[in-house]
């Protein structure tokens, strides 16, 4: 098995961006553990972790967007603009659903989940459309992204309905699930 075979600059951007997103999830998870543990003062480490999550997340989006944009010029698959429009439409549908139907305060996590899902699906689409991923790998990764996004949305909707301890654990589920999906994505891309 050969890793990183014929990697071009756009492939490295997508790989590095996903790696940074994995680090972002881990920093965010560390912040969550430190800041929201029941009966805990939080401590000063929380500020470091959330800052690191923000920086790695923004850098990841920039890198992945560059790689996706470059590859989309040659992609014969689903155009990325349809994925982005679908993600934006879903976000704007879920804003009132979240507030009106579920009576849940809208927080930045709703936007973060949509950005993550659209970014990952866009990467899968261009990697499939350029022939880097076969249909099996593309469908598997897209399904994992979909499952992780739906799990995150369910946890998001339930968060304020749970007691302190349950909501603490509930908040870790999307971060852990997304980190797992990104680790799988990195492994699949490395050997493709």
Q: Which role does the model predict for each range below?
A:
Residues 129-139, 151-170:
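Membrane-helix boundary connector in multi-pass membrane proteins
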Residues 89-147:
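Membrane-proximal helix-loop-helix units in multi-pass membrane proteins
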Residues 1-77:
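N-terminal topogenic module of multi-pass integral membrane proteins
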Residues 171-183:
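Small-residue-rich transmembrane alpha-helices that serve as helix-helix interface/gating elements
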């Amino acid at each position: 098995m050969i890793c990183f075979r014929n990697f071009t600059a756009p492939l490295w951007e997508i790989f590095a961006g996903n790696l940074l997103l994995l680090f972002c999830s881990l920093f965010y998870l560390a912040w969550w553990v430190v800041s929201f543990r029941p009966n805990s003062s939080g401590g000063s480490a929380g500020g470091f972790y959330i800052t690191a999550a923000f920086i790695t997340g923004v850098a990841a989006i920039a890198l992945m967007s560059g790689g996706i944009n470059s590859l989309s010029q040659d992609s014969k698959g689903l155009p990325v603009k349809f994925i982005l429009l679908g993600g934006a439409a879903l976000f704007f549908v879920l804003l009132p659903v979240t507030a009106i139907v579920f009576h849940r305060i809208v927080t930045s996590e709703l936007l973060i989940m949509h950005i993550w899902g659209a970014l990952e699906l866009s990467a899968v689409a261009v990697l499939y459309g350029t022939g880097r991923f076969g249909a099996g790998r593309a469908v598997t990764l897209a399904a994992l992204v979909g499952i992780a996004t739906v799990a995150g949305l369910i946890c998001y909707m339930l968060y304020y309905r749970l007691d302190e301890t349950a909501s603490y654990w509930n908040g870790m589920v999307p971060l852990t699930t997304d980190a797992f999906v990104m680790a799988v994505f990195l492994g699949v891309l490395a050997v493709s």
